[in-house]
Design a protein with these regions (language model features):
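Conserved catalytic cores of phosphodiester-cleaving nucleases, focusing on short active-site segments
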Residues: 71, 136-140, 144-156
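Active-site metal-binding core of divalent-cation-utilizing nuclease and nuclease-like domains
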Residues: 82-143
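Arginine/glycine-rich "motif VI" loop of SF2 helicases in the C-terminal RecA-like domain
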Residues: 174-180
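Active-site-adjacent loop/helix micro-motif of nuclease/hydrolase catalytic cores
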Residues: 156-167, 194-196
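Surface-exposed cleft-lining segments at the edges of enzyme active sites
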Residues: 52-56, 121-127, 151-160
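Nuclease-adjacent, charged terminal/linker segments that flank catalytic cores
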Residues: 1-87
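Domain-level recognition of nuclease-like catalytic cores that cleave nucleotide substrates
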Residues: 182-208
Length: 208
C-alpha cells in the first residue's frame, strides 16, 4: 500500500541520517534497551558511537510523523503541532490541578479514570474565562466531524511526562467543550519484555 511505502521510505531516510550523525559523536557508556535493539538490530554492535538519550529524542519525532502520515491517509484532516485556543474557566483549571495533585500523593487519593476525570472537568467548565492555549502533537478530524487531539510520547514515559499527558487531555477537553472531541495520549509500543507478557515488565507504567 502507498502509506506503508511512505512510512518505509521515511524511516529509512531518518534512521540513515541519524546513524550518520551519531557516528561522529561517540558516547561509550550507554547500552541500548531491548526496544532500541529490535528497532535497529545493529545498534548493539555499534552503540558506543551513539547516545541513548539522543535516540529517544529523535524517535519521538518519528512516531509523531508516522502517526501524521497514517492519520492523513484515513481521516479528513491531519495537522502536526496544532494550537488549541479557547476560554478556560477558573473552576475548570483549578479542578484539573486538583485531579493531578490527588493522583500524585502517596498513598494515592485518586485512581485515574478517563471518563470520570473528563466529565468532572466539563461539569465545572463554563463559557467564560481567560483565553488559554496549548498545543496538540497531532490533530485529526474524522470525516464525521469528530476532532481528535493526540499527545504523543516515547516508549516508557516517566512520571512527569505522564502527568503532562493527563493535563493536556483534560485541558483540551475543556477548551473544546461543546464540540465532538476526543483528547488522547499515545506511546509507541515498547516490547521491553520479549515474552510479550505485560505482567513481566521490569518496570511499571506510571498511572495518569
Amino acid at each position: 500500500p502507498p502509506i506503508r511505502e511512505a512510512i518505509r521510505e521515511y524511516l529509512f531516510a531518518e534512521i540513515t541520517r541519524y546513524w550518520d550523525e551519531s557516528t561522529t559523536s561517540a558516547r561509550a557508556s550507554e547500552v541500548p534497551s531491548y526496544f532500541h535493539t529490535l528497532l535497529v538490530p545493529t545498534a548493539m554492535k555499534l552503540w558506543h558511537l551513539a547516545s541513548k538519550h539522543s535516540f529517544d529524542t529523535r524517535t519521538g519525532s518519528w512516531w509523531e510523523y508516522i502517526a501524521y502520515l497514517i492519520g492523513g491517509d484515513y481521516h479528513q484532516t491531519a495537522i502536526r503541532q496544532h494550537p488549541v485556543i479557547g476560554p478556560l474557566s477558573n473552576a475548570a483549571e483549578a479542578h484539573i490541578q486538583q485531579i493531578l495533585e490527588d493522583m500524585n500523593v502517596r498513598p494515592t487519593i485518586r485512581q485515574p479514570n478517563r471518563a470520570t476525570d473528563i466529565s468532572e472537568v466539563l461539569t465545572v467548565q463554563g463559557n467564560q474565562g481567560p483565553d488559554r492555549s496549548t498545543r496538540s502533537d497531532l490533530y485529526l478530524k474524522r470525516h464525521d466531524g469528530t476532532e481528535m487531539y493526540f499527545e504523543i510520547k516515547t516508549p516508557g514515559p516517566n512520571k512527569g511526562q505522564c502527568r503532562e499527558m493527563k493535563e493536556r487531555i483534560l485541558t483540551v477537553s475543556a477548551l473544546r467543550k461543546g464540540h465532538s472531541t476526543l483528547a488522547l495520549a499515545g506511546c509507541a509500543y515498547n516490547p521491553y519484555n520479549p515474552t510479550g507478557d505485560a505482567d513481566g515488565y521490569a518496570w511499571g507504567m506510571p498511572s495518569y
